[in-house]
């Protein structure tokens, strides 16, 4: 049937901020869904609190509510926008949970759910209802029991036995789940799982550890047509969350008989659950010996795996699911890549490998052991002609300095221990075991990874050990290595290792070129080349191909520009950079220039098949970039939008005289080189904090003594503030140097950067655009947290509350830097205002993570403006094209936007609740995974909204726990007095209690954990604490860390700096005032 005409206003619920388990994949699916609904003529209304997403750009929906995703807000939008139907299946667990809460409160009267009805959501998400539905249709399930209390859980474990898996209903990314091997572990896991489930329901089931795990991406329409889009196999056996597992498509160790059983079961499950207009993900486990197949769970929505399946096959699951939700059937929908009906099941003639990206180095105390609760921050995908080619390409894509199967250890006992323990480096330890002569069967007993995968790694190791310089003149051998996925850099490294002969990657490339060994570029076309592909979505392979290679036909010379993406999501480089790359592609379209996108992240909008004119899915390594440049003969390359990843390639690109457009490499080099940049600032007479570069440990002590404490130290060439610390005295410096030199050598090549730390300074971020002649100061973002907390973790807002004199100076200095550097495009400058003086902290001649937020706040697409400037080098023209009404200031070559009449605030979102053992205290090393935006008529209300959106709601009354470090106590007492005046009660441990008492602020003294019972943890567990204020630091004792862990565990809202408390007080003082719920389009009128 054609599209429905009985509905017109459709509300799409987004997934909110990037968190572990819900990342860019929902921006990809949401953007695709918004575009589809709009193209079909529906009025689209969106709610999503994440400003870094493409889907929240005003042009993708008619009304865009960047507001907290709460039942109350959704109900207000339903009434205000006269919503006919809600599409909740594109917003992950957040959207499903929101509509379930609304249903339970009776808030969905007269509104239809599209894609999945309430009954289907309940059956799919409620583990008891799912079990009953599966038993009804004869599906085998793991033996299990449900529990709603800790007592029922204990009864269940007596029946199930150990080891047992505990799973919580209606949670994201395995939240609250785990494997218990004994009663003590079980009791803690059961309590946590009951707390994590919004309906206090948990499932205790028999352990399936060691079983093989598979996922089926299924689509069903209203005519009961069903297709399997993709079958994904987990290399890691059951026991590791599928989001943390290395996965492959198509499945490689599944017999056709098993596949058909799984396919039939998937269709039967969708029919029983009631998913009749959309996509779902169904997970199975198969015993490797008995072949018993059990159903694990299903998601009645588009999921993380759906995004992977879409990118792996080229089949646009989110678009098709959206069209099915509004009435179409599969045979009525056209596959955009081949122009064949969407009812054709995709067929793959290549192998896809996904590897997760972790950030354990950022969180001391967090175990890197993987289990049923997800821990990864991002992922990469690689495509190859065979398994090993795809696997090695994926390893190279992770950007953690692995060139392939790097050797990690020669200690066999240590290696065996690491193979037993699921962890991000397990495959590399398996390779090390094979290097030491361990057989496949012995490795299998340690890890339960299928023997076929293990034998492939063993084969790779055998080949590696035979690599020597003779391959450089032997075409057959060299082609064979490239066919197995060996990068030029890895071949060079193995020649050095095996022969002690220095060979550079360039020499390997030259040898390849002389022997005419170049990659073939093949298409992802959903049909194994059976039909002609109309949209170029390409990957490289050295695998032999019986078909002729795809030619890069160019009827006439069209201008083309290559955009180098940002690679895997990680802390410090997230969705904000992908947003900028997407905008670059859209801006090139406006210029009638062909865009070529290059990335390896399957979650993102940039790797959607219709974002750019040509898409290359490849590791972001110089070897791959060079081959694409040579193939495409591009007229320009953009390296400034993907964060540090493409910027690191700029030097090699400049050497080969590649056409980098925008800010040239020599400018990037000045900004990135500490000594060159300090000289540059001296020439311009711009103040920066006292600093020095220590090239040895002794030099570090002498520089610190000259500068004076406190100091901030950081090694060179690290991302996201890794190993960066604030040190108060010589003893702390000594301890730091002793610990950091274990991880990093301080030398002339790797100096330690030492700066004077400006205490109590106000930090600012400035984003600007320059064309070498004029400058556009897009925004001055004021940080709430003081200097010393990484800018990516600090809340910031616009317009600034600083004096006009300081703001004028910031604009003047920013313009001076941009023009004298010779920036063409975006740049980001960080300043600190200390004792009324302006200091420059750093300059990044690239897009920053604040660009998407600022673009939303101003209504100006900054990345598009910058792209146009990079191509045309005409700032005035670019602003006129994209910002017809907003420029108000022009003086001395400086443009300024009209400041908003509202306050827009960006707040960071952290993964602490997913990473057990992490500490919520912030510092110079970045820890946040995502962000939210609060928009309101005042700073206090914007902050109030942002805290609600980032799961840290501000309470209006109750008991506040206060723990203040000594140096903050005097200032804190003044603020605490205001909290008491607002009606709050305070409680504190002895030191803070005495300080409050001395200042005349009433508080209840509570015991520390080590002082007896009942203590502060008991109060938290009993739900008596409404909020916590803790300004301790990482140097505080274990007792304080346990208290902070209790804050997280018991979902207590918390605040960790005095500057945040000042804004919290504003929020509390204004929270009783009504603030109308407005769409972004209304704010920008």
UniProtKB/Swiss-Prot annotation:
Q: Where does Mg(2+) 2 bind?
A: 297, 299
Q: Name one GO cellular component term.
A: cytoplasm
| Residues bound to Mn(2+) 1 | 283, 297
Renumbered to this chain, the signal peptide range is none
Q: Where does Mg(2+) 4 bind?
A: 842, 844
Free-text cofactor note: Binds 4 Mg(2+) or Mn(2+) ions per subunit.
Q: Where is this region: Oligomerization domain?
A: 400-552
Keywords assigned by UniProt, alphabetized: Amino-acid biosynthesis, Arginine biosynthesis, ATP-binding, Ligase, Magnesium, Manganese, Metal-binding, Nucleotide-binding, Pyrimidine biosynthesis, Repeat
List the cofactors.
Answer: Mg(2+); Mn(2+)
Show the segment(s) annotated as Allosteric domain. Answer: 952-1085
Q: Which residues form a coiled coil?
A: none
Give the GO terms filed under biological process for this record: 'de novo' UMP biosynthetic process; glutamine metabolic process; L-arginine biosynthetic process
**Keyword presence, tRNA processing:** no
InterPro entries found in the cross-reference section: ATP-grasp, ATP_grasp_subdomain_1, CarbamoylP_synth_lsu, CarbamoylP_synth_lsu_oligo, CarbamoylP_synth_lsu_oligo_sf, CbamoylP_synth_lsu-like_ATP-bd, CbamoylP_synth_lsu_CPSase_dom, MGS-like_dom
What is stated about domains? The large subunit is composed of 2 ATP-grasp domains that are involved in binding the 2 ATP molecules needed for carbamoyl phosphate synthesis. The N-terminal ATP-grasp domain (referred to as the carboxyphosphate synthetic component) catalyzes the ATP-dependent phosphorylation of hydrogencarbonate to carboxyphosphate and the subsequent nucleophilic attack by ammonia to form a carbamate intermediate.
Provide the family line. Answer: Belongs to the CarB family.
Known NCBIfam families for this protein? CPSaseII_lrg, PRK05294.1, PRK12815.1
Official protein name in the record: Carbamoyl phosphate synthase large chain
Q: Which organism is it from?
A: Helicobacter pylori (strain ATCC 700392 / 26695)
